[in-house]
Amino acid sequence: MITPLDFIADLFNPSLAFLPRALAAVLLASVVTGVVGCHVLMRGMVFIGDAVAHSVFPGLAVAFVLGGNLMVGGLAAGVVTAILVAIFSQNQRLREDSVIGIFFAASFALGIVIISLAPGYSGSVQDFLFGSIVGVSNEDITHAAIMGAVILLVLWLFHRQIVTVSLDRESARAMGLPVLALDIVLYVLVTISVVLGLQTLGNVLVLALLVIPASAARLACRRLGSMMVFSPVFGGLCSVVGLYLSWAFNLPTGGTIVLSMVAAFVLVWAVTAIRSRARAQLKN
């Protein structure tokens, strides 16, 4: 069995250069999705992570048929779909999750139609959708770091306004806030953060990083600011543990990281439940 010390030594082994790159990729994703996930959870649109992964398909299909860059094609399709969802969600008679489902289902269907016209598509497109964390390049890390910094900067600049819209849209409109523009900003940021992680981490791991750490933070913290600190730390620690376990026992990396997060979430849930019960007994 590979011990934690052996794992640390392997991280500095030049012949295993893919291992520290995989660790860097998952840690960067943990930080970005940890913060973005808090907004997603507060907004009640947990479904969006999986939906975005499907919405990129038309862009992937067009990029593949034309011989273009899959990342650029997927990102363009995801952003366009996100903007359309934000616009149509302004109708108060439509639930936001309903609009998400309609547009992202349509996007995926369109992608299937386009890609079916091109033979030999399965390999490269599947790599994008399901990820290859051990195949992360230095260029992938650089791109993720730059875009992650941009996402966090924009969220920091518009934090108060986005939170206000998420909590009470009518009050936000009464205050004169540009609700549509802020919706577009949030949707586009979520889309970019998900698409950036798809090619390296895959759909399942990105969705887990978007939802599980933020949910654990919601249980453990009372304030949004504390959640946005707890969530990335939770995701990062679980990712390190999951990567170690997958390396030590020769298990699938993405699945092991997800299971590590689920186990940690259950632990947080149990601890908070016990703590809440103890407080209730003290009050009585």
Predicted regions, residues:
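Helix-loop-helix "hairpin" substructures at the membrane interface of multi-pass membrane proteins
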Residues: 29, 141-213
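Loop-to-helix entry region at the N-terminal start of transmembrane alpha-helices
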Residues: 17-26, 124-152
